[in-house]
């Protein structure tokens, strides 16, 4: 390991920029540094009167284990629209890892979030009607929200504070994907340090 790197898990309250940058945390701790990489979504994003589009891609995924070989690990399902939630744009995708296990994820594009039991009901319906199993074990759960917006996140960078991730505008507004941008922008950051 590198003795110059220390992992700290804190919730960041604020970042001030002067001669040395001070990152203050909810716990009351303060850290100083030359560069800050900030993935927080700025407060200005939550304003509703600025004219920017705000749709949320939100999802609940289960890694499931079934008792019979119902999945083909050589095939995945990207946008299955057979299970619908009310009058929304939604889909389910399935990423099998074996004939018995897969990530099954229900995703919606809406301005407002739905209740957790509604995601769960859609996943249960998909498992029953599309996979053919009501007897399955949930091994892992993931939940996420990705802003789908034309808000200019990246306009908030400074000489020494770099916005990264969603808060840095790395997410493609039309798809919610960020893998390629994360790779490209991370390389640029490393080259400029």
Model-derived features with residue positions:
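FAD-binding beta-loop-beta segment adjacent to the flavin cofactor pocket
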Residues: 86-89, 143-164, 169, 173
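A general structural signal for well-ordered alpha-helical packing
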Residues: 120, 158, 164, 183-186
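Active-site segments that bind and position negatively charged phosphate/pyrophosphate groups
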Residues: 171-181
């Amino acid at each position: 390991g590198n003795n110059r790197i220390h992992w700290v898990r804190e919730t960041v309250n604020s970042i001030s920029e002067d001669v040395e940058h001070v990152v203050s945390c909810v716990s009351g701790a303060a850290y100083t540094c030359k560069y800050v990489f900030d993935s927080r979504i700025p407060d200005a994003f939550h304003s509703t009167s600025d004219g920017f589009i705000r749709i949320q891609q939100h999802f609940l995924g289960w890694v499931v284990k079934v008792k019979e070989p119902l999945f083909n690990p050589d095939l995945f399902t990207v946008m299955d629209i057979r299970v619908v939630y009310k009058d929304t744009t939604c889909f389910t995708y399935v990423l099998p890892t074996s004939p018995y296990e897969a990530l099954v994820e229900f995703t919606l594009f809406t301005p407002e979030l739905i209740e957790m039991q509604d995601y769960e009901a859609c996943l249960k319906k998909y498992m029953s009607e599309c996979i053919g199993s009501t007897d399955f074990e949930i091994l892992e759960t993931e939940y996420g929200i990705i802003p789908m917006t034309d808000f200019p996140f990246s306009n908030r960078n400074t000489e020494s504070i770099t916005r990264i991730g969603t808060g840095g505008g790395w997410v493609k507004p039309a798809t919610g994907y960020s893998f390629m941008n994360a790779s490209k922008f991370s390389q640029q950051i490393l080259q400029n340090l």
